[in-house]
Amino acid sequence: MKIDLTEVHKRLEAIRAERKITVDSQKKDYIVNVMEKFGELASAIKDYEKYSQPDWSYPSDIQEAEQEIVKAICDIAVLTLNVGAEVFFSKRVPLLDTSTAPQNVNWLSLLISDCADFECYEDYNSYVHFYNILMVCAKLCEQYGFNFQLAMEEAAKEISSHTGFFDEDTKKWKQDYRWKAQTTWYHADYELARIEKEDK
């Protein structure tokens, strides 16, 4: 499956600019943030495997687990697109072809762990790792029955709807988690990205 994340990349770039989020700040927290999301992905996959057993009595739980898997995958991809923003356009990373990509979640873990060895995220090695992380994310998404490009568009739409403010003291954008604020947020509908059986 061929995937073009150019528009998603541009949307994330606009969000960063609006919220005064620098690429350097994304680099600083990348490993911690992406490992947290990988933990959520592993947990969702574990739930999916449990709910997929023949003796499980609640089939709807499978769909919920799939949604959590796709959400975690997209979160990892968003973090990776943000931290690699300075190299992606020059290397045309937003253009992906998953036909030869591995779909092993352990491979994704290895790629993420290797990033911890980089002191900067602008050299060729980090570019290759970022590209491969996105490729594996796309393939995993496809494996669980979802179109990665459409899922990422939903994720970007949700992120752009979040409200908050830039804290001048910490120099960070802080999300407004108050209930009233959350009622205005868009919630990504990953079902819109589900691949119909005849399209697989």
Where are these regions (language model features)?
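Flexible "arm" and connector segments at domain edges
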Residues: 1-200
